[in-house]
Amino acid sequence: MKNTGLCLNSAYFGFYAHAGFVHGLVRGGFEPSIVTGCSSGAMIGALYCAGIDMEEVVRLIQKIRKNDFWEGNALTQAAKIFARGVSRYSGLLTGRKIRALLEPYLGGLKFSDLKIPLGVAVSNVTTGRRELCTEGSVLDSVMCSMAFPFLMEIQKMKGNDYIDGGVVDHEPTKEMILDPSVRTIVVHMIETERETPPRSPIVRAFHASLSIIDHETRDLKDRLALARKTKIVRAMTRTPHLGPDRTHYGETALHAGQKSAATILRSLKIPRSRANGRGLA
């Protein structure tokens, strides 16, 4: 759809709901001119922009289980800390199995190869800056954007260290707001329902910090969008709490994403149209 951007936000194990949401949009005839994504949103956004049929993406996501991305066990993880030392340890997973899972779809692709312009939000630990990747390796950028602190090791790209873009930017819309060719931005947000709050004070403080950053930056971007007369439409999908040992709730999350897409399509009255945007600056 001309002049319309799509943003897939950062969400822990949010690839189920994001896949369902994009699948639902595609079935409804919606095609954005630009896509941005962060963390799990970057993964689904990249697969979609690469031209992978969303039916195939849904099948891929439905099959994901812990063994597809988890590395080792408690003993090998402890040995890893001992071998590297605390000062050089940055996460449980190297990300190699996730990269292998995505390699058949994104391996070797540059951003310039994509069917739809894509921006991937990442956090540059080396420079202390948030970045939106629009050039270079798509897979490298997605891996950096998905490197959730302490779960996945810090990722290397072009000589710099990177972690999950969602640490500082849950919904990367700034560049689209500043792009005069984009008049409407559809943002897919995911909210997970935790059965009980985290008991650890450190974990609670970490999650609270992310939430505060998210709310503050969202408010600023909403003000920027208002000033530039860019319409932001948010679709909220609520899912069960997901994680490495809770992938069995993935199907529920996927269907919830599809329902959110149907709601957005009805509210926006999206016509069947092909994109014709300029890309991200």
Task: Give residue ranges: language-model regions.
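Patatin-like phospholipase
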Residues: 1-38, 46-281
